[in-house]
Amino acid sequence: MKKLFLTLVIVFAGIFTANAQVWLGGSVSTVMSKDTKSFEIAPEIGYSLTSVPLTFACAADFVYIKSETPFREGTGLMLTPYIRYTIASVEKFSVALDAMGQFGLMDAEGYRVGLRPIVAWMATKHWTAAFSVGFLGYDKMNYEHGAFTLDFETAAPRFGLYYNF
């Protein structure tokens, strides 16, 4: 317990001493169709590795998902570490690409790896709104019927809001 507490102190000390390099926020996504109902919320923390227009960043989010599909029903928790590469920035807008992996924790079994495009708008010095649609990659979830997919999903856009320190 002491080691965990010390680790958390060091992590938060690093976060609060980093100037304009850390963001904190999250995103939400929902899918409603005839056969599928899904809702996910994903709190997130990230760190910019460079501060030039073409930036690299690393981050992770914890996804809480509740879904009802013909193959599966229930809730789960997933960890999504990713590296973000900002491709272009024009005034307050930027386009980025996340190279991500998503791993199931607890009841959510399986994993997925791939690319996720992001469009972000920096509303103020500290607040950024982001929009993401699509995922191109490999998806292996442990459904009853054993689904392996390589997909470009456009059904579940994600909307995020981030505070930049």
Predicted segments, located by residue:
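Repeated loop/turn-to-beta-strand initiation elements of outer-membrane beta-barrel proteins
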Residues: V22-L24, V52-F56, V90-S94, K125-A129
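Helix-adjacent hinge/juxtasegments
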Residues: I65, P70-G104
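Structural signature of outer-membrane beta-barrel channels/translocons
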Residues: G46-T50, R84-A88, G104, I118-H126, ...
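Outer-membrane beta-barrel "beta-signal"
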Residues: D151-F165
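Transmembrane beta-strands of outer-membrane beta-barrel pores
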Residues: V28-K34, L49, A60-K66, I87, ...
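Sec/Tat signal peptide C-region and signal peptidase I cleavage site
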Residues: I15-A20
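Hydrophobic, lipid-facing positions within transmembrane beta-strands of outer-membrane proteins
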Residues: F39-P43, L77-P81, Y111-P117, A155-F159
